[in-house]
């Protein structure tokens, strides 16, 4: 039995090759892989000794040869194939172990040139993977170091890999080469200014119990590109498995949290904030956000942009919550909160990044793609269009409300005072309805003066402004654009 090994990621390859040799396999290798194996004391055959042809073009051509692909593709049960191999002096190759040039890592480097990117496009590797994967009934194809131990265990146990494992590895290899080609195609198309095709790559995080409703099947996938404030890369420290609706709500909460640099907390229900506040620290921000709407937060989701301390944990523990998210939890906070077995605690990466991100929204039979809105222009005094100028406190509250209302379902109105929401009017078919809801909530807390109001859309009529003025609102921020 013969194995051909040619890897860029050399993790575990020496141990794998040594294991194959101990099981009686011959090991063939190329360039750097051969050098590493030989220096590590593994008996290895140079690929050039198999092909009878040297590596040429700075290593661009080394395995593209009939003695490689004939040995991989020949069917062991086809007399014509066997005859062709004998006549041409070609021997079987029973395993290919290949991982590809690091194209993704190369193009991710700042300042990388196109020439550098092109030199990291693997040609021979994908060709060998595809040949071996096509002939999976007889050939084992390996593209992931994580599979080395499983393969060695099967050979030790059965004398060779099982047909089932070879089929699984074949599917994995084709997935790997498809992702690799899509990545290269995307890069080249961007350089060429072409956008009529869109290739997407997502990996399964977990199957979900069901979707938005119990009769809908669902799964959770993540993109190959790690980004901050992403639930897909969160670490769950406690609680039940996340549901489809949990994930949607948690994602909406994280979008709000990333708006703030100062200590901040938001409570959220059904993808709308019900209470949000800035504070001195996590405990203070939570207290203010909770007091903004003690009723709606019941069974909700909480997200903070500061580590959860014991003090904050003890304040949150008495309240029934589904999820608490933060950049971290102190050991003392975990001790307090983990006694609630169903409470999901998620540690979410929250480092700042200016990297451009895409937002994908599915429509029936299609997909909308836009840049993710990561820019919120601060509210400043020079934006004022009235003779009366806002105070510094009002400006701070207007800026706070502007960042919150961006994430409320339209028509959206948010009423704010002293760095916390007092009322949130969401999702009404007319703007006055949302204003009435938000102001009613603020007045129910006994606050009837010193308010500011933020609107996610312009006012087509003066009804909202008149209502606000009569309800204790002293300043308004809105995008403008009304012809009236």
Language-model segments: residues:
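Short, charged, surface-exposed secondary-structure boundary motifs
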Residues: 38-40, 54-61, 150-154, 333-337, ...
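Non-catalytic interaction/clamp surfaces of large macromolecular machines
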Residues: 145-146, 150-198
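Short hydrophobic/aromatic-enriched beta-strand-loop microsegments
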Residues: 25-28, 41-54, 96, 140-141, ...
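Mobile "lid/hinge" segments at catalytic clefts and subdomain interfaces of large enzymes
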Residues: 128, 135-148, 169
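Active-site/ligand-binding-proximal alpha/beta "capping" segment
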Residues: 76-123, 130-133, 383, 387-392
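N-terminal glycine-/serine-/threonine-rich phosphate-binding loop
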Residues: 1-50
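Glycine-rich nucleotide/cofactor/substrate-binding loop typically near the N-terminus or early
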Residues: 32-103
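ATP-dependent carboxylate/acyl-activation modules
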Residues: 1-3, 180-484
